[in-house]
């Protein structure tokens, strides 16, 4: 699978899960979306309606005079001047833009020194402006004569009376915070607190007091303790009532003479007249409102032909609300991030939102209504989103790529449009995926099946070849189980390929081709290309300026040589180049330091002499007022009861002022508390970090670009926040059973199968499985190695089956002649124990940790014993050197098959066999014991080894002898079967010959679990102990093909031992107290053995030497299920219903989840999922990495533990006479297979998946062998 296919699959899965979430919890999602819309639209309360923002008009400064009060141009004659440009303006605004910095900077300065000393110079500037007088031939003119005189503030602004001027000239500066008193400023210990004390606590989008007095947005002022640019910017705002050109020119000349800006290239050519419209402009809204009405009508007209939509007008209204909310959210978010959207220069943006939103609505509607109607609503929504997920994400990625390219063209018009567009796309995607999808799910949910049956479908209008009495909609015939719910399936393609109405064809064409979005993207690319080439301040000019600046021939003179990265610049804050060493003494006032720039003097020769000034000016500084809120000037004039509605003001060119402050002035301007405050000295920053930004044309620096980058970063952060919110909502509200439709929680019903990619639901099928019969009682143990299948029932009978053909190869014990007509039979189980006199057949004791298991030589089966005699082989004693006691001290609990009749004549053996006959009388129907011979030990020793109580509840017809005990565990590898019995006896059988290879004569506690891995056998016992055994053969092992039907070309998955070999089993290690209570679970993999016990703990052993590595504690109940694989991932389940994931390498618990309300009965894992089942009849699927529950499947009663994993994507579960196949990735029910009438009433108690794509189902005393290759081929 390629990367694109994997990415497409992941995106499809994400959209599928999202559709399930929206359809499962519609009301909370709609409420959440509504809150998000309101929160994003809150900044719009302070914005004008579209079309009511201020309008600009520029005129040259040279020769300017106020226009006459009456327009002199004729009616209907075209004119360049707008209609509102008549008469004198309300006021003339003159801003003196001040940039100041402390240079050079060294590490001994504090953060407060960045702005305290520069702000102190504002008082001197204000004093210079107030004292300026124009003297010419006509007389003298002072500021008081030409400025706008204001009176009292409005009565509701008492708090601002000490900050804003009254009864005098309207002059604003940062000094107003301290009533223009330098002493008050110098005595203020907290400048930041004074500036922000009148800031609103909530979100404020209109002009604030700080913006009014500073004249620049707060983020550009540099008055902050955490600024990285050590530069302070503010303006001194003068408001004139009359335009006096000579006075303004003299004021500009004086200020530029006192505070020169040598690198300033600001143009002072134009006046900008700003006209403010009425607060409510209905006329401008008519085109946009008309567009949305047309959108509503078109969607309603189009959806009238879609029968799958319940409320046509409701869907159209939801589409309009989605598009309108997307527009409002975009404008609100842009305002929140610092942009001032007026939509004057981009009226096309709302209409683009309409077009894009309409197309997305049509795409989603078409995709959802095209899904099969027999599916549940949430599955239809999920499949509809999943089918369009790739195209949606591909178009969104393309649009974002075009926007990103356009943003980095450095053209302001393109950058503004791109910022609006990216926020608009994110908000539109958010609303489409949450709001409209949820509303669509609610509408489709109202479309009940009863409503569908009330109207005739289109296919009923077709001529029918059958009689008229045929029903209109064909029902799929249910061959069996007529009581089950019917399934409505789609008709064949010949019925479905009807001619659609024209309006639907238009909708489907737009949705299929996405023509509108592609045309918009193409137009955007062309527009960006034209603006990039023609814009004078765009990327082309910027690159040309960079080349010219670095060229030695640029502009006819040698430009500044670029400094390598390893060379320190002049303003580097290294101590060796600092103007003040850390321990430098304070100098007298009449001395200056080398390299310092004295006031009113040129640059001195020294280390800190910088020919490139740090304070730079760029084209964006000419009209900095544009960055202010559009309500900045109306708010200022409203304070004095002056309205700007239907009037205009004139903005004069900015007067630049540059202030260079040396460190000594910053130190002298400190407040005594500054050194003891929390403003700790900041670490020095490289000079490049606090310069204005990248240099633009002419060597200027465009720090406005950095602002745009910040806005883009904020937009990206907003998108990430929205995604995180969606993720949190998904994690919190995601239904745990979203993958299963139906009435019950997470329970699938027949007839509710999801459809495939072609729109068809997979049918329910019924097959005739291979039924494996031969057990008298319920099957308890199953084992397989892929080619052989071994089963054991409660009666102790072991059957070996061919997993390919279902033939019974061997039965252990072998059947013999019937004894009576009751249906039972005595099978020949007596091996040739009498042939022990043939020497060498019984292996002697070998040195080791414990006595070896006795092996049995192979040979033909001997004749059976008399059916009416008990087994007296236990009384045979070959040790003639020891005198037997007259009576055994311990009872001999041996049960064998026999009639128990005694002889009438002959030697009286009653003293020896009386107890055996009495016991045989209690259980006369039991068969002879299957026991290897004992060559030497005396009878008491044999009695002690095999002393176990008989089974109380055994049926009269049983297969396993009571002395050996019932079979508790079973394992298979190759052709060897390892059996663990309740008496503690371990037996190794040949699966093909049906003979006993070897057994353990040391009777101990019952074997509860077995592990047969390679040549090692591990037995877990009831008393909590572990025994490690090793299989050995006297000749080499060779993989052989066991006897079976021809045609199986594959070899067995494990080694098959040759029949000529003699197998012995030695116990290598014993852990006497592995657990304090019985061991209930045992698994081995990757050289590790994991045990689980009723003492609530797990233990990890090394398989080689039985060394205990870890004891894992985390469950509050007995361990019931354990899983471990080759990746060292361990999962455990207990009676507390919890599932724990462990790291076998470290012994640490990775996660814990409470999965079930009862015991965890089985546990398995795939590469990405953990699958568990419990006594609550639920199968839960968990994410393996996060431990989050994906979904659950409710099983039929008694089928909770019947599950199997065929592959990483396919799960099989059992039901009442059926098996179901599920897609693990999506939780989809793929197919349900019924196993015939014989198994209809039987629950599948156990499922075993074989290597040859076969499934073995345990239905009580019968097994069903099922092959489902079609599902496997489809998934693979």
UniProtKB/Swiss-Prot annotation:
Phosphoserine modifications at: 821, 837, 843, 850, 905, 934
Segments carrying motif ER export signal: 447-452
Tagged with keyword Endoplasmic reticulum: yes
Residues exposed to the Lumenal side: 40-279, 334-344, 423, 540-707
Membrane-crossing segments per the record: 19-39, 280-300, 313-333, 345-365, 402-422, 424-444, 519-539, 708-728
Region annotation (Loop-1) ranges: 46-284
Composition bias type Pro residues, residue spans: 930-940
An individual GO BP term: regulation of fatty acid metabolic process
Locations listed in the record: Endoplasmic reticulum membrane; Golgi apparatus membrane; Cytoplasmic vesicle, COPII-coated vesicle membrane
Protein name as it appears in the record: Sterol regulatory element-binding protein cleavage-activating protein
Species classification: Eukaryota, Metazoa, Chordata, Craniata, Vertebrata
Record gene name: Scap
């Amino acid at each position: 699978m390629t990367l694109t296919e994997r990415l497409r699959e992941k995106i499809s899965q994400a959209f599928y899960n999202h559709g399930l979430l929206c359809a499962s919890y519609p009301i909370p999602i709609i409420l959440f979306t509504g809150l998000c819309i309101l929160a994003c639209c809150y900044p719009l309360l302070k914005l004008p309606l579209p079309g009511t923002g201020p309008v600009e008009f520029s005129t040259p400064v040279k020769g300017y005079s106020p226009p006459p009060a009456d327009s002199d141009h004729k009616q209907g004659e075209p004119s360049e001047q707008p209609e509102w440009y008549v008469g004198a303006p309300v006021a003339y605004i003159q801003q003196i833009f001040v940039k100041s910095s402390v240079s050079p900077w060294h590490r001994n300065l504090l953060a407060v020194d960045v702005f305290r000393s520069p702000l102190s110079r504002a008082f001197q500037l204000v004093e210079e402006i107030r004292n300026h007088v124009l003297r010419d031939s006509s007389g003298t003119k002072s500021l008081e004569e030409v400025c706008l005189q204001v009176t009292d503030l409005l009565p509701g602004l008492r708090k601002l009376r000490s900050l804003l001027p009254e009864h005098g000239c309207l002059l604003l500066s940062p000094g107003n915070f301290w009533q223009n008193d330098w002493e008050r400023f110098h005595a203020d210990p907290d400048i930041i607190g004074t500036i922000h004390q009148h800031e609103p606590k909530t979100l404020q989008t209109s002009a604030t007091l700080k913006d009014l007095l500073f004249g620049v947005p707060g983020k550009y002022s540099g008055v902050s303790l955490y600024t990285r640019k050590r530069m302070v910017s503010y303006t001194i705002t003068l408001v004139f009532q009359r335009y006096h050109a000579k006075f303004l020119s003299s004021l500009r000349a004086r200020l530029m003479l006192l505070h020169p800006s040598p690198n300033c290239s600001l143009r002072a050519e134009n006046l900008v007249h700003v006209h403010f419209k009425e607060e409510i402009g209905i006329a401008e809204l008519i085109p946009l409102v008309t567009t949305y009405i047309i959108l509503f009508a078109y969607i309603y007209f189009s959806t009238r032909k879609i029968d799958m939509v319940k409320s046509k007008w409701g869907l159209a209204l939801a589409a309009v609300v989605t598009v309108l909310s997307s527009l409002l959210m975009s404008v609100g978010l842009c305002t929140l991030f610092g942009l001032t959207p007026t939509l004057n220069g981009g009226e096309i943006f709302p209409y683009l939102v309409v077009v894009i939103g309409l197309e997305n609505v049509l795409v989603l509607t078409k995709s959802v209504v095209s899904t099969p109607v027999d599916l549940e609503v949430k599955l239809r929504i999920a499949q509809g989103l999943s089918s369009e997920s790739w195209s949606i994400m591909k178009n969104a990625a393309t649009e974002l790529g075009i926007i990103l390219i356009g943003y980095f063209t450095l053209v302001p018009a393109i950058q503004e449009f791109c910022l609006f567009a990216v926020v608009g796309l994110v908000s539109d995607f958010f609303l489409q995926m949450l709001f409209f999808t949820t509303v669509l799910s609610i509408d489709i949910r109202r479309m009940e099946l009863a409503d569908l049956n009330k109207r005739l479908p289109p296919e009923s209008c077709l001529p029918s070849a059958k009689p008229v009495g045929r029903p209109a909609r064909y029902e799929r015939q249910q061959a069996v189980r007529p009581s089950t719910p019917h399934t409505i399936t789609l008709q064949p393609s010949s019925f479905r390929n009807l001619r659609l109405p024209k309006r639907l064809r238009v909708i489907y064409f737009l949705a299929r081709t996405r023509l509108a979005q592609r045309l918009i993207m193409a137009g955007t690319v062309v527009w960006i290309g034209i603006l990039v080439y023609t814009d004078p301040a765009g990327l082309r000019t910027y690159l040309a300026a960079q080349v010219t600046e670095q060229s030695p021939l640029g502009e006819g003179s040698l430009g500044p040589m670029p400094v390598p990265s390893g060379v320190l610049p002049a303003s580097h804050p290294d101590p060796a180049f600092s103007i003040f060493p850390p321990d430098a003494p304070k100098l007298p006032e009449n001395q200056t330091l080398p390299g310092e720039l004295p006031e009113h003097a040129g640059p001195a020769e020294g280390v800190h002499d910088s020919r490139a000034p740090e304070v730079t000016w760029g084209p964006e500084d000419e009209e900095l007022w544009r960055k202010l809120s559009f309500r900045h000037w109306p708010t200022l004039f409203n304070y004095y009861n002056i309205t700007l509605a239907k009037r205009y003001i004139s903005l004069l060119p900015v007067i630049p002022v540059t202030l260079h402050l040396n460190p000594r002035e910053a130190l002298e301007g400190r407040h005594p508390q500054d050194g003891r405050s929390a403003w700790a000295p900041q670490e020095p920053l490289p000079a490049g970090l606090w310069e204005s930004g990248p240099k633009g044309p002419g060597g200027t620096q465009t720090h406005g670009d950095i602002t745009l980058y910040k806005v883009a970063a904020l937009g990206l952060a907003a998108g990430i926040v929205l995604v995180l919110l969606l993720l949190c909502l998904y994690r919190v509200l995601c239904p745990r059973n979203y993958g299963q439709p139906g009435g019950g929680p997470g329970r699938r019903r027949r007839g509710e199968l999801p459809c495939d990619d072609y729109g068809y639901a997979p049918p329910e099928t019924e097959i005739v499985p291979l039924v494996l019969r031969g057990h008298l009682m319920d099957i308890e143990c199953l084992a397989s190695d892929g080619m052989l299948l071994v089963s054991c029932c409660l009666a102790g009978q072991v059957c070996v089956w061919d997993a390919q053909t279902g033939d019974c190869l061997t039965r252990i014990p072998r059947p013999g002649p019937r004894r009576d007509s009751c249906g039972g039979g005595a099978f020949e189980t007596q091996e040739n124990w009498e042939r022990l006199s043939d020497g060498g057949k019984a292996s002697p004791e070998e040195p080791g940790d414990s006595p070896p298991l006795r092996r049995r030589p192979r040979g033909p089966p001997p004749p059976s014993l008399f059916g009416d005699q008990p087994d007296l082989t236990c009384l045979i004693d070959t040790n003639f050197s020891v005198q037997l006691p007259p009576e055994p001290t311990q009872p001999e609990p041996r049960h064998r098959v026999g009639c128990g009749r005694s002889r009438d004549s002959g030697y009286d053996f009653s003293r020896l066999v009386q107890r055996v006959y009495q016991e045989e009388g209690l259980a006369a129907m039991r068969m002879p014991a299957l026991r290897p011979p004992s060559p030497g030990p005396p009878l008491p020793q044999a009695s002690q080894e095999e002393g176990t109580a008989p089974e109380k509840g055994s049926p009269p017809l049983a297969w396993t002898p009571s002395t050996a005990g019932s079979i508790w565990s079973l394992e298979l590898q190759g052709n060897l079967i390892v059996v663990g019995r309740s008496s503690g006896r371990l037996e190794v059988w040949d699966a093909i010959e049906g003979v006993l290879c070897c057994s353990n004569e040391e009777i101990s506690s019952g074997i509860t679990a077995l592990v047969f891995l390679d040549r090692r056998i591990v037995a877990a016992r009831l008393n909590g102990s572990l025994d490690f055994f090793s299989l050995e053969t006297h000749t080499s092992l060779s993989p052989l093909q066991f006897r079976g039907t021809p045609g199986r070309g594959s070899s067995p998955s494990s080694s098959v031992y040759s029949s000529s070999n003699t197998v012995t089993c030695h116990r290598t290690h014993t852990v006497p107290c592995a657990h304090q209570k019985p061991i209930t679970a045992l698994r081995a993999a990757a050289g590790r053995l994991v045990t689980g016990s009723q003492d609530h703990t797990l233990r990890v052993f090394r398989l080689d030497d039985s060394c205990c590595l870890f004891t894992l504690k985390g469950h509050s109940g007995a361990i019931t299920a354990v899983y471990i694989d080759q990746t060292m991932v361990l999962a455990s389940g207990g009676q507390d219903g919890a599932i724990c994931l462990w790291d076998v390498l470290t012994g640490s618990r990775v996660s814990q989840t409470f999965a079930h309300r009862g015991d965890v009965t089985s546990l398995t894992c795939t590469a990405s999922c953990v699958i568990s089942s419990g006594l609550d009849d639920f199968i839960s699927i968990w994410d393996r990495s996060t431990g989050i529950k994906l979904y659950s499947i409710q099983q039929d009663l008694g089928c909770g533990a019947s599950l199997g994993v065929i592959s990483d994507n396919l799960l099989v579960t059992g039901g009442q006479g059926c098996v179901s196949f599920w897609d693990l990735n999506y939780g989809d029910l793929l197919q349900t297979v019924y196993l015939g009438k014989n198994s209809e009433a039987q629950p599948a108690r156990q499922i075993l998946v074989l290597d040859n794509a076969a499934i073995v189902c345990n239905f009580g005393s019968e097994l069903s062998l099922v092959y489902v290759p079609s599902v496997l081929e489809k998934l693979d």
